[in-house]
């Protein structure tokens, strides 16, 4: 009887789990955001070499690292851009983590959008500070080249940690899904 009871309990648990997964898949609760490969990064209009796995690309004030297909752009007291030009300081196409180096302040400014991104998720995190100053536009904006977004081409800005300051005439973040994930 004991073995029969244990077998019955195990079968019921498996049935409940299977039913739960079935219901979750019907309501799209089991799918995560598709990763969008990083295809382009520009800093102050200059195209950045996207490094191979385990490699880095480095300039004064920033480092772009590829860690098993996850790209991390670390800002280290980067002072870039100008309020006299509408060119974005950072342009991104694909998933990118913007890492704020501990105890540093990076200041980016533009007459137009400071950070312009296409599809993919821009994650901002770290223990530093990022100041975005725009004279006439939003600090972070999207440009999807006239394309519609779908499940294969998601777009979001994810704010995890760090100090983020927006100054200027425009809004902070425009035309984006914003995810807040505090530590």
What are these regions (language model features)?
Residues 10-18:
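Alpha-helical transmembrane segments
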Residues 1-10:
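N-terminal Sec-pathway targeting helices
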Residues 5, 17, 21-183:
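A composition-driven surface/loop motif
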